[in-house]
């Protein structure tokens, strides 16, 4: 029987792994790394998604599914991550969307993460170019990623359903960053498959009455025999929407880059999502890419030689040269199948 060995959520000092068994807590000071394992890349045929999250709101509680009358509205909140409010006080209401007739039971936290149908979501904040940034004060966007995660868990059973719902919500209501002014990635899994969706905002001048999408987003499926990591950085590269089993995206996924001069369709060069919308790569992202891929697939290519052989050499062993981030793939086939314990071990790693 296919099953999801689902979400490893590390919330500042606590972690919860929900499956048929409970895994002991994992502790982390701070991080926001997602690791995804396809069903043919795991030791027991499970799909694994994980999330280390340093959000303020680490309390976890169950929100039961409910039935609603026709025409009901669902509030859109700002403040879901506020740990100072009562447990079921989700903050200020920014607006409303149509409610569904029935919602599913889910685990609620600062980044809510799994529902009764084993749909699981991990989150990792990315970085976006300054021209795309917006905020609550200056923009009209109202949909934060943590709110969209809740709507997906309440309304969806499958990963690709969740991708479509979240993308649609972001387009219609506008993506409002809540972790600084930055973009977001979600690793969404069900018992059969896993997807990565990346969401970028469209600046402060967006108007919901304009008819234009209130976000730029793209999603790619992780191959069943592959693993992937999202270390607070975009990982989606070239997108082929003719391959509907593998890619999804908003209608404006190229146009915004064209409008800003970040890509010229007449140049003859392919459109690379990661390059178009991400700023200059940072070492804290490339180091995690390197550690993960050189560990799970050491012979995939000649990875940069960043291994520290002398712990006493150098003032700061982690700040080394910055390699071209394009050398790291979207995903890779691991040389050894991974278990939940392997994922936990990597999430605990401190580059020793």
List the predicted regions and their residue ranges.
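Short, well-ordered beta-strand elements within core beta-sheets of diverse protein domains
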Residues: 149-155
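Intrinsically disordered, low-complexity segments enriched in Ser/Pro/Gly/Ala and basic residues
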Residues: 4, 13-14, 286, 293, ...
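A contiguous strand-loop segment
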Residues: 21-145, 165-318, 333-335
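Long, well-ordered mid-to-C-terminal structural blocks that present hydrophobic/aromatic surfaces
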Residues: 316-352
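Alpha-helix boundary/capping residues
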Residues: 11, 166-170, 350
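Bacterial Sec-dependent N-terminal signal peptides
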Residues: 1-21
């Amino acid at each position: 029987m296919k099953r999801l060995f689902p979400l490893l959520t590390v919330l500042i000092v606590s972690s919860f792994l929900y499956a048929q068994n409970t895994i002991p807590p994992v502790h982390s000071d701070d991080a926001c790394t997602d690791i995804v394992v396809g069903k043919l890349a795991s030791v027991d045929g499970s799909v694994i998604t994980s999330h280390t999250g340093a959000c303020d709101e680490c309390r976890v509680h169950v929100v039961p599914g409910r039935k609603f009358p026709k025409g009901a509205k669902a509030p859109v909140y700002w403040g879901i991550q506020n740990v100072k409010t009562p447990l079921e006080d989700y903050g200020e209401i920014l607006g409303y969307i149509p409610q569904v007739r029935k919602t599913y039971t889910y685990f609620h936290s600062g980044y809510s993460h799994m529902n009764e149908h084993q749909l699981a979501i991990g989150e990792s904040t990315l970085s976006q170019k300054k021209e795309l940034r917006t905020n609550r004060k200056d923009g009209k966007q109202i949909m934060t990623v943590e709110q969209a995660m809740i709507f997906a868990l309440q309304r969806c059973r499958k990963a690709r359903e969740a991708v479509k719902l979240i993308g649609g919500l972001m387009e219609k209501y506008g993506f409002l960053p809540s972790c600084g002014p930055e973009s977001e990635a979600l690793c969404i899994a069900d018992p059969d498959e896993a997807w990565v969706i990346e969401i970028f905002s469209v600046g402060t001048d967006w108007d919901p009455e304009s008819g234009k999408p209130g976000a730029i987003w793209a999603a790619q499926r992780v191959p069943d025999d592959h693993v992937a990591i999202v270390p607070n950085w975009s990982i989606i590269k070239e997108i082929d929407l003719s391959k509907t089993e593998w890619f999804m995206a908003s209608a404006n996924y190229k146009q915004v880059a064209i409008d800003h001069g970040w890509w010229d369709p007449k140049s003859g060069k392919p459109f690379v999502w990661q390059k178009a919308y991400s700023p200059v790569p940072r070492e804290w992202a490339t180091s995690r890419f390197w550690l993960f891929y050189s560990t799970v697939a050491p012979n995939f290519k000649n990875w940069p030689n960043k291994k520290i052989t002398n712990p006493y050499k150098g003032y700061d062993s982690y700040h080394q040269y910055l390699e071209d981030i394009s050398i790291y793939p979207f995903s890779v086939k691991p040389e050894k199948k991974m278990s939940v314990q392997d994922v936990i071990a990597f999430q605990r790693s401190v580059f020793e």
